[in-house]
Amino acid sequence: MPKMKTHRASAKRFKKTANGGLKSASAYTSHRFHGKTKKQRRQLRGTRMMDSTTVKTYAKMLSTL
């Protein structure tokens, strides 16, 4: 049986929390801010927690983290 390998693209984008959740940076933050309101830009700062149903899928890809 071959070793389980971490999906490297996902490992660079997501961090595992102490309780087993996953956090990541917000999407839509690289350019085209003139089309976003001040409130949208403010809320895009920081990190986001991944939905619990999606965490199960990504946990397999990030099994070795």
Curated annotation (Swiss-Prot):
Segments of skewed composition (Basic residues)? 1-16
* Disordered: region residues: 1-24
Asked if the keyword Ribonucleoprotein belongs to this entry, the reply reads yes
Q: Give this protein's Gene Ontology molecular function annotations.
A: structural constituent of ribosome
Q: Which top-rank group of organisms is this from?
A: Bacteria
- Pfam family for this entry, one: Ribosomal_L35p
Q: Which GO terms describe its cellular component?
A: cytosolic large ribosomal subunit
* InterPro entries linked: Ribosomal_bL35 (IPR001706), Ribosomal_bL35-like (IPR021137), Ribosomal_bL35_CS (IPR018265), Ribosomal_bL35_sf (IPR037229)
NCBIfam families named among the record's database cross-references: rpmI_bact
**Belongs to which family?**
Belongs to the bacterial ribosomal protein bL35 family.
Name-wise, this protein is: Large ribosomal subunit protein bL35
